């Protein structure tokens, strides 16, 4: 499955959320990560993130698709993210 994770969390937790997410996904833009995950790894990621966030003030969204091939990606402006991640 292909997962896009988008988060908006309290400043105190940003670094911790990013550290957890980068164990599973590639950073592509501020507060956005994406990549292929097995269902088991996806569940582990959600569990780790849910233990860290404050559900009263933080928001984390997961967009889950069967494959990266089911959508088109267009970037305007600067490409951000980790080197070596190619679409």
UniProtKB/Swiss-Prot annotation:
Any Gene Ontology biological process: maintenance of CRISPR repeat elements
Xref: InterPro entries: CRISPR_associated_Cas2, Virulence_VapD/CRISPR_Cas2
Recorded superkingdom: Bacteria
Signal peptide: none
SUPFAM superfamilies referenced in this protein's UniProt entry, alphabetically: TTP0101/SSO1404-like
EC number: 3.1.-.-
Keywords, sorted A to Z: Antiviral defense, Endonuclease, Hydrolase, Magnesium, Metal-binding, Nuclease
Required co-factors: Mg(2+)
Annotated residues for binding of Mg(2+): 8
NCBIfam families: cas2 (TIGR01573)
Subunit structure: Homodimer, forms a heterotetramer with a Cas1 homodimer.
Family classification: Belongs to the CRISPR-associated endoribonuclease Cas2 protein family.
Role summary: CRISPR (clustered regularly interspaced short palindromic repeat), is an adaptive immune system that provides protection against mobile genetic elements (viruses, transposable elements and conjugative plasmids). CRISPR clusters contain sequences complementary to antecedent mobile elements and target invading nucleic acids. CRISPR clusters are transcribed and processed into CRISPR RNA (crRNA). Involved in the integration of spacer DNA into the CRISPR cassette. Functions as a ssRNA-specific endoribonuclease.
Descriptive protein name: CRISPR-associated endoribonuclease Cas2
Organism, as annotated: Thermotoga maritima (strain ATCC 43589 / DSM 3109 / JCM 10099 / NBRC 100826 / MSB8)
